Amino acid sequence: MAQKKGGGSTRNGRDSESKRLGVKVFGGQAINAGGIIVRQRGTRVHAGENVGIGKDHTLFALVDGHVQFAVKGAAKKQQVSVVPAA
């Protein structure tokens, strides 16, 4: 006779792949035009000077330069800009 009962089954054991969201280039770091600065869902960080926004709300540099983060307005919204290289 078998020494073990059947293993049964479970409804657990699944998880989605991580989406690798977040800041990719931090304040003060150099970036090339087209380089991704932030990957995000929604506009947690807003686009400032020389920063474009993709259809998935990804922020990217429009010019070569250095990344600069700031907090703007009464609502204290975070904004990222690119200061052009001299």
Swiss-Prot record:
Note whether Ribonucleoprotein occurs among the keywords: yes
Record keywords, A-Z: Ribonucleoprotein, Ribosomal protein
Q: Which Gene3D superfamilies match?
A: 2.40.50.100
Which family does the UniProt entry place this protein in? Belongs to the bacterial ribosomal protein bL27 family.
Q: Which Pfam families match?
A: Ribosomal_L27
The UniProt entry, under SUPFAM superfamilies, shows: Ribosomal L27 protein-like (SSF110324)
Biological process (GO) annotations held by this record are: translation
Protein name (record): Large ribosomal subunit protein bL27
Superkingdom of the source species: Bacteria
GO MF annotations, alphabetized: structural constituent of ribosome
- What is the protein's species of origin? Cupriavidus metallidurans (strain ATCC 43123 / DSM 2839 / NBRC 102507 / CH34)
Assigned GO CC terms: cytosolic large ribosomal subunit
Among InterPro entries, the record links this protein to: Ribosomal_bL27, Ribosomal_bL27_CS
